[in-house]
């Protein structure tokens, strides 16, 4: 999937997200926010200027969120994003209301909508995690000027082919037909079992 496809999936297939920001004491605060639009490099949402959520966005200019879709754990897809935000103001409100017409029931009059403002997540990174696939499927992406930050584990040239890692990998995602062994990153849970059991320290964090 392309970055735009990930962002569009958040808006069109999930929509409701749980957003985390930080308060004045440095403590996390969460709230439910609908992601209402996306383009090739950003996401858009709105909030009211009177909310404490608005104050936190203005002060920190950063957020993180997770969006989930599925009937239960084993049918779920989760997309997590963290990134920089900026306020765009009122101009995009009519467009977002047309794309999410239920908002007209919450803010029914033009006057009531004057409290609203649009924010853009213009730079960030994200992760796709699909538990409905066997083996699981994961991918990372970045947008704006952000770069992907590799996570998980890799096997170095110190590998001695002892197969200890193969025995403890819950997704059987370690390839053993080459030296050193290789982790299939798109299926890895990042559980760290391979790192823990390797007798020669050949498994390192990326």
Where are these regions (language model features)?
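A short, Trp-centered hydrophobic/proline-enriched beta-strand micro-motif
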Residues: 9-28, 63-67
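Short, structured beta-strand-loop surface elements
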Residues: 55-119, 123-125
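Short active-site oxyanion
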Residues: 40-44
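Iron-sulfur cluster-binding cysteine motifs and their immediate structural context
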Residues: 164-181, 193-206
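Short, surface-exposed beta-strand-loop junctions and turns on beta-sheet-rich folds
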Residues: 51-53, 72, 135-136
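A short, well-structured catalytic beta-strand-centered motif of the EAL phosphodiesterase domain
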Residues: 33-37
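Ferredoxin-type iron-sulfur electron-transfer modules and their immediate structural context
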Residues: 116-118, 123, 127-168, 172
């Amino acid at each position: 999937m392309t970055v735009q496809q990930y962002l569009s999936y958040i808006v069109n297939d999930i929509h409701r997200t749980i957003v985390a920001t930080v308060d004045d004491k440095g403590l996390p605060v969460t709230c439910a926010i609908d992601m209402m639009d996306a383009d090739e490099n950003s996401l858009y949402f709105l909030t009211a200027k009177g909310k404490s959520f608005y104050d936190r966005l203005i002060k920190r200019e950063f957020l993180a969120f997770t969006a989930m879709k599925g009937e239960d754990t084993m049918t779920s897809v989760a997309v997590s994003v963290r990134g920089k935000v900026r306020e765009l103001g009122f101009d995009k409100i009519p467009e977002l209301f047309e794309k999410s017409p239920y908002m007209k029931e919450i803010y029914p009059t033009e006057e009531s909508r004057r409290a609203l403002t649009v924010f853009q997540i213009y730079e960030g990174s994200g992760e796709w995690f699909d538990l409905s696939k066997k083996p699981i499927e994961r991918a990372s992406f970045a947008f704006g000027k952000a770069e992907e930050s590799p996570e998980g584990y890799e096997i170095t040239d110190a590998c001695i082919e002892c197969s200890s890692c193969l025995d403890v990998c819950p997704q059987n995602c370690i390839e053993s037909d080459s030296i050193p062994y290789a982790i299939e990153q798109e299926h890895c849970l990042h559980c760290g079992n391979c790192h823990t059991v390797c007798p020669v320290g050949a498994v390192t964090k990326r």
